[in-house]
C-alpha cells in the first residue's frame, strides 16, 4: 500500500497528501512509512484513562492536549480537548525541508480553531502530509490535496464492466474462454472488487449467471451498439461522482491500476486513462461528461467524448504494456497467459 500511495500521489501532481479513514485504519503508520523520521512532524497519542499528548519533533517537546473524562459514554472519544499549541505548528514552519507531517487531525483538533488556522497557514509555505479521522475529512479547507480514504479508496467512483462484445475475431464468446483455470471475465471481476458501485453490462446469459452467483450487479440486454452498453451502465449507477468504463478482455489489468485511476479522478475535472507509450483503457469520466455519454451517436463509445475534449484528458503512466492488451484472438490469450 505504501508504494501504491506514493506512486499515485506523484502522478496526481497535487501539493498536499491526506490519508483518511476510521480509527485503526493505519493512517499514521502509513505516513510514518512514506516520510522518514527526520521529516518535521507533529504526533499525538492517547494514554488510556489519562489524556492525549502531542509532540513536535523539531522541538523534542511534549504537551498534554486532551483529558480523559470518565463521565463520557464511550467506549471511544472519551477525551475532552485542552489547548493545542500553535507553537508546535510554528516549529514545523521554521524547520528545514519542503514537507511537514501532522499524524492526526480529529475531533480534538477541531475544537481548537487557532491551532487549525495555524495549520492551514502552514500549508501555504510547506507541503503537508495529514492523517485525518474520517468524520473530519470533509472539513479540511485546503486546496490541491490528494485524498486517500483507506477504508474505501475507490470512493464514489462507478465501475462499468463492458462485457457485451460478440467475440467475432475470437471465434466465440472469449469472456468465457479459460484463462489460468477460470473464465477470462473472472479476471476483471476480481480486479474491480474494491468498487462498491459496480455493474456488468452484457448480452450473454452465461456471464449474467456468473455475476449472480457472486452477488455482482448485472444488466442483461439485447441491444446492438456500444453506445447502448455505455448508456445502460451509467443508468445503472445513478448517483456516482465519476465512472470508469472497463473492458472485460484485458486479463492482466490489475486492481491497483483501477484504484489508482479512481483516486486520480477524484479531482473531478479531467478524463483519466492509463498509458504505456500509447493510451489505453479503462477510462474514468467525470460527472460533467455523463450527459454526453448517455447520448452518444449510434455505435460510438466513450472514445467519442475523449476525442471531443482532448485538453481535458490526463494520463496514468504504467510500466507493463500487457496490462492494456486485449485478448482478441485465442493466440493472444495464450500469450498473455504465459
What are these regions (language model features)?
Residues 29-77:
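N-terminal phosphate/diphosphate-binding loop that engages ATP/GTP or pyrophosphate donors
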Residues 23:
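The conserved Walker
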Residues 294-338:
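Conserved alpha/beta core of the MobA/IspD/sugar-nucleotide pyrophosphorylase nucleotidyltransferase superfamily
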Residues 26:
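Conserved glycine(s) of the Walker
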Residues 225-291:
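Conserved beta-loop-beta/alpha segment of the NTase-like Rossmann-fold superfamily
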Residues 157-205:
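N-terminal glycine-rich phosphate-binding loop and ensuing alpha1 helix
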Residues 186-244, 256:
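Conserved N-terminal catalytic core of the sugar/cofactor nucleotidyltransferase
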